[in-house]
C-alpha cells in the first residue's frame, strides 16, 4: 500500500506548473496508474515526461535520421554511440547541452555539462580521451555576455583540466539572439577499454542494485524540467536547479568504474544525469524489460531530512547506478571505497515491470516502467506548408542589391562609407565570430594524456592519437580519430533545410581536411519553443536536412541531444528565440596519424590549389561579409550538391594519405579571402594569389560562401607526383567539380590579384594582430 507521506494534500495546479505538466498529462498519469499520483510520483513523471528526457516534441522527427552503418556498433538508445574505428578499437562518443543551467550559473552550469557527458562515455566502458565544445553567446559589446563567456569558459576549463581529459577543439559564435539564452554544447570521445560494451539494461531478477560515487544532496532538484522550459526574468531564482560538480571525484569515478567493468562483475550501468535516480532506475528497468526496487534510506546523502521527492529528483553530480553480480558485492564495494567513493546496495532487480521506491519503511512510489520511460507522451504538431513570409522575402535578395564597386572600393551599408578590400578583410578578421579563439582555448589543457596531434585552432578538425597498433614493429604506427563540431546558425535561421545540410557537410569537410574519413555523427538540436509554428517548422526542416545529408555522405546518427525552449522572455513578456542551432559533431578515422595535416602553409613556394563544385552555390547571400560589413542578415544560403561534396572530400583525403597535400583548409565563414588569411596567420607566411573573374563583383569572389570549397597546398618537392595523381584521377572527375592552382606560398604578405589587378596587399603581421586580439580585448 502506498504511503502518500501526507503529500497527497497539495495544490494540483501549482504542482503541475512546477513540474511543467499539463492537465491532460495529469489525466493520462491517473489513467496509467489507475489512481491519483502522490506528489513524489508526480515529480517523477514531471522529469521523465519532460522534453529533456523523453523528447516528447521531437521524437517523430528524430525517426527520420539514418542510424545504421557498416561501422556503427551502438546507435541511439544507449548512453552514447559506439563505432568501429579499425584495429579492434571502438570509439564511444556523444554530445549534450547544458544551456539553461549555464545561463543562470555559468561556471557550474558549464562545468557539470562536461562532467555529465564524460559519464555518458565511461559508463559504456570507455576511457574519455577528448572533449570539444560548441558555444553561443550574445554580442560582446554587452557586459553581461562578456561575464557569461568568462564564466562558461572557466567552468569548462576547471572541470576538464582537473579531471585530466583534454579539450581539443570546438567552435564559438556571437549573435544577439543568444543574449538571454547562451548555448553550451559539449562533445566527448572515449576509447573502449572493456572486452564488451557495457549497456544499461537490468538483468537477472534478484541482482543487487549498487549506488556508487558522490553523495546525494538537494542540488539540481528538478533540473530536467527546468531545462525544458523557457528562460524568464525570474530564472535566476532557479539557481538551486543547477548542479555543483567535483571533478576530482569524477576522476576517481572514471578509474574505479573502468576497473570494475573489466572484472565482468557489473551487469549493467547507468549514470545519474538528468532526472537523477528517477531516470537511471527507470531506464535500467525499461531497457532490461524488468523492474527495480529501491530503498531511499540506503542512499548515501549529504543532507538531513531529505524527502523522497528530493532524493529522486536530485541531480547531484558524479553518481552511478549499477546492477551487479550478487556474489561480487563485497569485492566491488571494497574496490570503490579504495577510490574514496561511496558504494551502497540500495535495491534489487525485480520481475515485475515497475519501479518501486520505499522511504522510511513505506512505499512512496510504484510506477510501471513503461509509463516512465518507454510509453511516454508524444506531442504531434502540424508543420506549416510554406516558409514564413519574412524568409521568402529575404530569399528574394540578390547580389545586385549591393552597392557597385568603384576604384577597388565598396560602400558599406552598415558604416556609410567606402572601404578597400584589404580593409574589409581586416574588419572581418577582427569580428569575434571569425577572429581567433585563442583567449578561450589557451585556458584549456589540450595536451593532457599526450595524444593531441594538433593544438586547437591549428587544424580544421581535432586529431587524437589512439593506442600503438603494432608493438613488435620497429616503426610505430598509431591510428587516430578526428572530430569536429559545426553549425552556421545564420544559414539555418535563413533556411533551416539548406543550413542543416551545410552543417553536416562542413563537419565532414573539416574531418576530411585533416585526412580522416568521416564515419558518423552525434547532433545537438538547439531550438526555440516547438509550440510556436515557426519554431516547429524550423526543427522539422532542420531534421529533414540533417537526414538527407547524412544519407548522402554515409555518416549515420548514433545519438545526441535535443534542447528546446531556448528563448528568453523579458519583463515586458517579449519572447526572443535563439537562432536555430543544430550542432553537428562529426567523427572520423585515420589509420596513421603521421599522415594527418593542419591548416597552415608549410614552405615558401609551395603551390596553393582550390577544389570545389560548380553545382553548389557560391554566393554572398547569408554570408559573414553581408552581416558584418553591410549589416544585413538576408539572402538564401548556398545550396550544396552532396554528390560533389562527397567527391571533393574523397579526392582530397586520398591526396593527403598519399602525402601529396601538406596543408588544407575549408572555405566557410568569410569566404576564400578569410580562409587564405587564416592559413597565412597560422604559418606566419604569406600567399600570392591570382584569380580570374568574369563578372564585376569582386566581393563575390573574395567573400562568398558555399561551393564545397577547400584550399590546399602542394609541396614544391611533390609537384610532379601531384600532376600524375591529377592525371590518374581525371577520368573520375565529375564535370561539375574543378581543381585549379590559384597561387603559391610567399614570405610575409597576403597579395591577391584579380584579372591582373591588385586587390589586396596586407602584411601577415597586420593580419595576425587583428585576428588574435579581438576577443581578448574584451577582458
UniProtKB/Swiss-Prot annotation:
It holds the Pfam family AIRS. It is found in: Cytoplasm. The keyword ATP-binding applies. It comes from the Bacteria. Signal peptide: none annotated. PANTHER family: PHOSPHORIBOSYLFORMYLGLYCINAMIDINE SYNTHASE SUBUNIT PURL. This is Phosphoribosylformylglycinamidine synthase subunit PurL. It comes from Prochlorococcus marinus (strain AS9601). The gene is purL.
Amino acid at each position: 500500500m502506498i504511503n502518500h507521506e501526507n503529500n497527497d494534500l497539495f495544490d494540483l495546479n501549482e504542482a503541475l506548473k512546477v513540474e511543467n505538466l499539463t492537465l491532460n498529462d495529469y489525466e493520462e498519469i491517473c489513467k496509467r496508474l489507475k489512481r491519483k499520483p502522490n506528489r513524489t510520483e508526480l515529480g517523477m513523471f514531471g522529469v521523465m515526461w519532460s522534453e529533456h528526457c523523453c523528447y516528447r516534441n521531437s521524437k517523430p522527427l528524430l525517426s527520420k535520421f539514418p542510424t545504421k552503418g557498416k561501422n556503427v556498433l551502438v546507435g541511439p538508445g544507449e548512453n552514447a554511440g559506439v563505432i568501429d574505428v579499425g584495429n579492434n578499437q571502438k570509439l564511444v562518443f556523444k554530445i549534450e547541452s547544458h544551456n539553461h543551467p549555464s545561463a543562470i550559473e555559468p561556471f557550474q552550469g558549464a562545468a557539470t555539462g562536461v562532467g555529465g557527458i564524460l559519464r555518458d562515455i565511461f559508463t559504456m566502458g570507455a576511457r574519455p580521451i577528448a572533449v570539444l565544445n560548441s558555444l553561443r553567446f550574445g554580442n560582446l559589446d554587452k557586459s553581461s555576455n562578456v561575464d557569461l563567456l568568462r564564466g562558461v569558459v572557466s567552468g569548462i576549463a576547471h572541470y576538464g583540466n582537473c579531471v585530466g581529459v583534454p579539450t581539443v577543439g570546438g567552435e564559438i559564435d556571437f549573435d544577439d539572439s543568444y543574449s538571454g539564452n547562451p548555448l553550451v554544447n559539449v562533445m566527448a570521445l572515449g576509447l573502449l577499454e572493456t572486452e564488451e560494451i557495457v549497456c544499461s539494461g537490468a538483468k537477472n531478477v534478484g541482482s543487487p542494485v549498487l549506488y556508487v560515487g558522490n553523495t546525494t544532496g538537494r542540488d539540481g532538484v528538478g533540473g530536467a524540467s527546468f531545462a525544458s522550459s523557457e528562460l524568464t526574468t525570474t530564472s535566476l531564482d532557479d539557481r538551486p536547479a543547477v548542479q555543483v560538480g567535483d571533478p576530482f571525484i569524477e576522476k576517481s569515478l572514471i578509474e574505479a568504474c573502468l576497473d570494475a567493468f573489466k572484472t565482468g562483475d557489473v551487469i549493467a550501468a547507468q549514470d545519474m544525469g538528468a532526472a537523477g535516480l528517477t531516470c537511471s532506475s527507470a531506464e535500467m528497468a525499461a531497457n532490461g524489460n524488468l523492474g527495480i526496487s529501491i530503498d531511499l534510506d540506503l542512499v548515501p546523502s549529504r543532507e538531513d531530512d531529505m524527502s523522497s521527492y528530493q532524493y529522486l529528483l536530485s541531480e547531484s553530480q558524479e553518481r552511478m547506478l549499477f546492477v551487479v553480480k550478487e556474489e561480487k558485492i563485497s569485492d566491488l564495494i571494497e574496490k570503490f571505497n579504495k577510490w574514496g567513493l561511496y558504494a551502497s546496495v540500495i535495491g534489487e532487480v525485480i520481475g515485475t515491470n515497475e519501479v518501486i521506491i520505499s522511504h522510511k519503511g513505506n512505499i512512496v512510489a510504484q510506477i510501471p516502467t513503461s509509463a516512465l520511460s518507454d510509453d511516454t507522451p508524444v506531442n504531434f504538431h502540424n508543420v506549416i506548408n510554406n516558409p514564413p513570409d519574412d524568409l521568402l522575402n529575404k530569399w528574394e535578395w540578390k547580389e545586385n542589391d549591393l552597392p557597385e564597386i568603384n576604384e577597388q572600393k565598396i560602400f558599406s551599408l552598415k558604416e556609410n562609407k567606402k572601404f578597400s578590400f584589404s580593409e574589409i578583410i581586416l574588419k572581418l578578421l577582427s569580428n569575434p565570430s571569425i577572429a581567433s579563439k585563442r583567449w578561450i582555448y589557451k585556458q584549456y589543457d589540450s595536451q593532457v594524456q599526450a595524444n593531441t596531434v594538433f593544438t586547437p585552432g591549428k587544424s580544421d578538425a581535432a586529431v587524437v592519437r589512439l593506442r600503438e597498433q603494432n608493438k613488435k614493429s620497429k616503426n610505430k604506427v598509431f591510428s587516430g580519430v578526428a572530430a569536429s563540431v559545426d553549425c552556421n546558425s545564420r544559414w539555418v535561421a535563413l533556411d533551416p533545410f539548406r543550413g542543416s545540410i551545410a552543417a553536416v557537410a562542413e563537419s565532414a569537410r573539416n574531418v576530411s581536411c585533416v585526412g580522416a574519413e568521416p564515419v558518423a555523427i552525434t547532433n545537438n538540436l538547439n531550438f526555440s519553443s516547438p509550440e510556436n509554428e515557426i519554431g516547429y517548422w524550423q526543427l522539422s526542416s532542420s531534421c529533414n536536412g540533417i537526414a538527407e545529408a547524412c544519407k548522402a555522405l554515409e555518416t549515420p546518427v548514433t545519438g545526441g541531444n535535443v534542447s528546446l525552449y531556448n528563448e528568453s522572455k523579458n519583463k515586458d513578456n517579449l519572447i526572443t528565440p535563439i537562432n536555430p542551432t543544430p550542432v553537428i559533431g562529426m567523427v572520423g578515422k585515420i589509420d596513421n596519424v603521421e599522415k594527418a595535416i593542419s591548416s597552415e602553409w608549410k614552405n615558401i613556394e609551395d603551390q596553393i590549389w582550390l577544389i570545389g563544385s560548380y553545382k553548389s552555390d557560391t554566393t554572398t547571400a547569408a554570408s559573414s561579409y553581408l552581416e558584418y560589413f553591410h549589416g544585413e542578415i538576408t539572402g538564401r544560403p548556398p545550396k550544396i550538391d552532396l554528390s560533389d561534396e562527397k567527391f571533393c572530400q574523397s579526392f582530397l583525403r586520398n591526396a593527403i594519405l598519399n602525402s601529396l597535400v601538406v596543408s588544407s583548409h575549408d572555405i566557410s565563414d568569410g569566404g576564400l579571402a578569410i580562409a587564405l588569411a587564416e592559413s597565412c596567420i597560422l604559418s606566419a607566411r604569406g600567399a600570392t594569389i591570382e584569380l580570374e573573374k568574369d563578372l564585376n563583383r569582386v566581393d563575390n569572389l573574395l567573400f562568398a560562401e558555399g561551393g564545397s570549397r577547400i584550399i590546399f597546398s602542394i609541396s614544391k618537392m611533390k609537384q610532379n607526383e601531384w600532376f600524375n595523381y591529377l592525371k590518374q584521377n581525371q577520368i573520375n572527375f565529375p564535370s561539375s567539380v574543378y581543381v585549379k592552382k590559384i597561387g603559391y606560398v610567399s614570405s610575409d604578405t597576403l597579395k591577391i590579384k584579380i584579372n591582373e589587378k591588385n586587390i589586396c596587399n596586407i602584411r601577415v603581421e597586420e593580419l595576425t594582430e587583428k585576428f588574435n586580439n579581438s576577443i581578448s580585448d574584451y577582458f
